[in-house]
Amino acid sequence: MSTVLRLAIQKSGRLSEESIKLIKECGIEFSSGGGTLKSVAYNFPLEVLFLRDDDIPGYVADGVADIGIVGENVAVETRKKMDTVRQLGFSKCRLSIGVPKAMEFTGKESLNGMRIATSYPNILSDYLFENNIKASIHEISGSVEIAPGIGLADAICDIVSSGSTLISNGLKETEVVFRSEAILAACPQLSAEKKAILDELMFRISAVKNAEKTKYIMLNVPDHAIQTVTALLPGVKSPTVMPLAEKGWSSLHSVVKESDFWEILSKLKEAGAEGILVLPIEKIVK
């Protein structure tokens, strides 16, 4: 029987959707609908397990799953022994302290003596210790935001994305305790065969991630301006330059970061560039 790498991902929610999208962008085809709990890829040695996010670190650490995509906050909180292969850049959030809006809060020192409700006692405990704060931790498994309103705690420490949940419960965000995003984690005891499959998967993931927020740009430029334009468009190594049928003109092809595009565009126009086309990129293999 051929070796198969077993991947654990969250069975529902935003992290699940992003994880499935990433794997499928790597050219790996598998079934992911209809309440599926296990799916074998059709064209890659990969089996996907759909689990509760809190269970993923344990499955990976115990070797039931070889690798897992999980929130960094969950991985750190569970204290399970896993190797972090790479951060994935999605499902970003933060674990923050929230206090009642009316409370006067002057800084971390204001937390001294407080009762703080949280579902992340380990991460919060580390934060309090590192900042020499003396506060008590009240662990609860859900609906953390309600704790100050019912007298269960003075403050909370919980996951924040937009902050709207805090506001709707009469709280304000004060201190960021931990910043998190999705990570790919692996069992430390992978066999050589499974490491080889993981290396191939990582090669594909890197190609997909390298292309994110990057655009392919094509433009026409007078030959006398090629050096100026080339300096603006470094590309992966350097821009591709091809002469056009019209004498004195060339076509340049390059890669630019989307965040830099508008600033570069103005400079390209100033240098005499015309017919600028911008296209999305699916993969970049370096």
Swiss-Prot record:
The record, for SUPFAM superfamilies, names: GlnB-like, Periplasmic binding protein-like II
Q: Please list the GO biological process terms of this entry.
A: L-histidine biosynthetic process
Report activity regulation. Answer: Feedback inhibited by histidine.
According to its UniProt record, the EC number is 2.4.2.17
Top class in the EC scheme: transferase
Task: List keywords of the entry alphabetically.
Answer: Amino-acid biosynthesis, ATP-binding, Cytoplasm, Glycosyltransferase, Histidine biosynthesis, Magnesium, Metal-binding, Nucleotide-binding, Transferase
* CDD domains documented for this protein: PBP2_HisGL2 (cd13592)
Q: State which pathway it belongs to.
A: Amino-acid biosynthesis; L-histidine biosynthesis; L-histidine from 5-phospho-alpha-D-ribose 1-diphosphate: step 1/9
Judging by the UniProt lineage, the source's domain of life is: Bacteria
Could you tell me where this protein is found in the cell? Cytoplasm
What InterPro entries does the database record attribute to this sequence? Answer: ATP-PRT_HisG_long, ATP_PRibTrfase_cat, ATP_PRibTrfase_CS, ATP_PRibTrfase_HisG, HisG_C, N-reg_PII-like_a/b, N-reg_PII/ATP_PRibTrfase_C
Q: Which PANTHER family match?
A: ATP PHOSPHORIBOSYLTRANSFERASE, ATP PHOSPHORIBOSYLTRANSFERASE ATP-PRTASE
Q: Which HAMAP family does the record cross-reference, listed alphabetically?
A: HisG_Long (MF_00079)
Function, as annotated, reads: Catalyzes the condensation of ATP and 5-phosphoribose 1-diphosphate to form N'-(5'-phosphoribosyl)-ATP (PR-ATP). Has a crucial role in the pathway because the rate of histidine biosynthesis seems to be controlled primarily by regulation of HisG enzymatic activity.
Protein name as it appears in the record: ATP phosphoribosyltransferase
